[in-house]
A protein has these predicted regions:
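N-terminal non-globular leader segments, chiefly Sec-dependent signal peptides
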Residues: 1-9
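C-terminal regulatory/interaction regions
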Residues: 242-270
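Divalent metal-coordination and catalytic microenvironments
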Residues: 30, 44, 54, 64, ...
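Active-site HxH/HxHxD metal-binding segment of metal-dependent hydrolases
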Residues: 31, 59-62, 69-145, 245-248, ...
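Metallo-beta-lactamase
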Residues: 10-11, 20-21, 26-29, 57-59, 77, 135, 145-148, 152-236, ...
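Active-site-proximal beta-strand/loop segments in catalytic clefts of secreted hydrolases
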Residues: 36-37, 47, 55-56, 84-86, ...
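Conserved beta-strand hairpin/beta-sheet module of binuclear metal-dependent hydrolase folds
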Residues: 17-71, 167-186
Length: 270
């Protein structure tokens, strides 16, 4: 809607700062971190092929590919690419990683639509942060699962940051549960009566409830600083094989996000 003011887009320098390379490492059996210093990408490995969640910036795609190979895997063995939300920091590298891997891209309908537009016509940011467009192969619905090689990944729709925002619940081969949580932030969004996203407030409130209700063993989020990535990696290096097992981390993340949202919503009340 042309009459709806947009939010200021973060500078590209911020995303580049988040995209510093780090070496891949194993989070737990069958789960590798292959992303950058603050933009998460995780590789779920099985004998039947692999699943990659999120693709960082376009310029990070070669680094993610190199990380997968350094971990001892082949990008061409990735069967599915999953996306949390369709902005340049989570979907920017998707076009290249899809082309290189031959994998099927799986996404919610709104994320698929926005990835096809290369991030343009963003409800909050307009055309400010484009990325290479990419076509989704499979539209996934809320609570729908895909299974591969003994693991099951279920889509949990958690809209608010974007209308298509999706968190992913993973049941690993050993029965442990991992959550890959999408952003719950509404940075500088105009929350009340947003003509481009009328359901924004009710959507994000519903997403707080959805994620707070999940009982998980391992909590991962799509930004490293949301789940203590670097601190937990250090614990892992110090010999703590359970460093990423964090059964309360998701609820703490939701509550922090909810409090920030309440403050923002209160400030915008007429």
């Amino acid at each position: 809607d042309p009459s709806q003011p947009l939010s200021p887009a973060p500078p590209l320098s911020l995303f580049k700062a988040w995209a510093k390379p780090i070496k891949p490492f194993q989070i737990t059996e069958g789960v590798w971190y292959v992303g950058t210093e603050n933009l998460s990408s995780i590789l779920l490995t099985t004998p039947a092929g692999h699943i990659l969640i999120d693709a960082g910036l376009d310029e990070s795609a070669p680094q993610i590919k190199a990380n997968i190979e350094a971990a001892g895997f082949r990008l061409t063995d990735v069967r599915y690419l999953l996306n949390s939300h369709a902005r340049l920091d989570q979907a920017g590298g998707m076009a290249r990683l899809k082309a290189w891997s031959g994998a099927q891209l799986v996404a919610s309908q709104p994320n698929a639509d926005q990835m096809a537009r290369g991030g343009r016509e963003d409800f909050a940011l307009g055309d400010a942060l484009p990325f290479p467009p990419v076509t989704t192969d499979k539209i996934i619905h809320n609570q729908e699962s895909i299974s591969l090689g003994g693991i099951t990944v279920t889509a949990l729709f958690t809209p608010g940051h974007l209308p298509g925002s999706t968190s992913w619940r993973v049941t690993l081969r050993n029965g442990k549960t991992l959550i890959y949580a999408d952003s719950l932030a509404t940075p500088d969004y105009l929350l009340i009566n947003n003509k481009n996203y009328p359901d924004l407030v009710t959507d994000i409130q519903g997403s707080f409830k959805t994620l707070a209700a999940q009982h998980v063993d391992i909590f991962i989020a799509n930004k490293g600083d949301r789940f203590g990535l670097l601190e937990k990696r250090q614990q892992l290096r110090n010999g703590d094989t359970q460093a990423f097992f964090d059964s309360n981390g998701l609820q703490q993340y939701v509550e922090r996000s909810r409090q920030r949202f309440i403050t923002q919503l209160t400030a915008q009340q007429p």
